[in-house]
Amino acid sequence: MCLLKQLSAAKMQSLSSLILATTAGVALGGNVVSNSQSAFVHLFEWSWGDVAQECEQWLGPKGFKAVQVSPPTEHIQGAAWWTRYQPVTYNLISRSGNETEFASMVQRCKEAGVDIYVDAVFNHIAAGSGTAIGGSKYGGRATPIYRAAGTGAGSPQDMHHSDGDVGKNCGVSDFRDKHNVQYCDLVGLPDLCTSCDYVKKTVVAFINHLADLGVAGIRIDAAKHQDAEELGSLLSAANTSLFCFQEVISGVGEAITPEMYTNNGAVTEFNYARQLAPNFLDEGKLQFFDGFGEKWGFLASDKAVVFLDNHDTQRGEAKLTYKNGGLYQLANIFMLAHPYGYPKVMSSYAFAGTDDGPPSSPVHSDGGVACSAGPGQDAPWICEHRWTAIANMAAWRRSAGTSPVGSFQKMAADVIVFCRGQTACVALNRLSSPWSGNAKLSLPGGSYCNVIESDDTSSCPQVQVNLDGSVNLQIPAMSAVALHTGKQANTTLILT
């Protein structure tokens, strides 16, 4: 089973001592994630070389925990983004690079303090027939990934299929029917029998190979379309040091729910964005975020991976994406400031059509990056994780640690202030005009960088917190002020 349990630093230290005292020769992973003090980034469709440079030059220094990368396995040819989600073999050759480049990226990121999470696709295989990006031939249910022992031919028995006809199968058509969702073909993609011995061994070998290369975690694509117990059995046979999170899209009245998968690992909480977005899009609703989290009907915080949008939803149901500019940035600030779940920041490329693939130009070149500098600014790669306000919230979140939200203050219908313990406070203004006023914070007295604008302690805009915690806040329109003890500008105090 994949690592999931969230532990405090004290408990981790105690557990480590116990393990050292009572076990020998047992490989235990160091990838336990404390959701309330970490964040990761999805570098969608980045090359392995670009990911490695980004870990070294940006993600590591900024304090991000990990990177989710696009599926590294051999896939069908084509420019559309979704070609990556039609695997032909589990060879590590893709639009992003080859296995040597992949392995180098994993190690370089690890040295920079950044883990790699792989988007793993093993619910299905590629549809149709042809030659894959690495030269492998494929043909639907006769794909080279799965070969009958000793025959050299594809084995249709490795797929779910219709009774009496191994060459055909039903299609997913009724989300109220569990069997239909999990044993029929999703949008025509041959559905793997992940409980079948040969398939299970093949997938486990693939996952273990990733772990051997230093990969720290996997996102399980289309987990909803695999029986939770069968998936759990497969994962329990794989490297147990990996952090796993499962894509389970929830829907009203559907037979399959995210809660069915929490025994296997973390789960994507799609309702997070669905409920958060309207409260940012509509005026006057920021005040209602007091009590936000599990009370809103979400998964338990330590089981949830949260996001505003992902590579699928930004082309579909998502109400907030980079195209919403400053409002999207403000919602990201809130997500990174709030302790619920393990937040994932989407890093997009510019697209007009829903099928558009990534830019042909690299992100890193000639010492610069082809990224937008902030909301509303054009560039081939959007790189939301590089927007100053979002990037600097990773360190803010680390400063907040495991502390819950305290002293939630409603300054106006669309202006809120809250702190996390005595180390981090944030004020958000969704108004179309600046807001100024006095608030009471739990921070020690001193001068702090407003990291929304800069985290350079020698030149950042400063906010003075008095010894009693009182502060005068000047918040620009559709923006925020974020202060934490990791970025104090100086030690000058004002006595009150």
Language model regions located:
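Active-site mouth loops of central-metabolism enzymes
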Residues: 40-49, 189-200
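Cleavable N-terminal signal peptides of Sec/SRP-targeted secreted and luminal proteins
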Residues: 5-6, 11-29
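Aromatic- and acidic-residue-enriched carbohydrate-binding clefts of CAZyme catalytic domains
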Residues: 35-38, 75-107, 144-193
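Active-site-proximal helices and loops of the catalytic beta/alpha 8
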Residues: 19, 25-40, 54-60, 64, ...
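Short glycine-centered, acidic/aromatic-flanked micro-motifs in structured strand/loop junctions
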Residues: 43-45, 92, 222
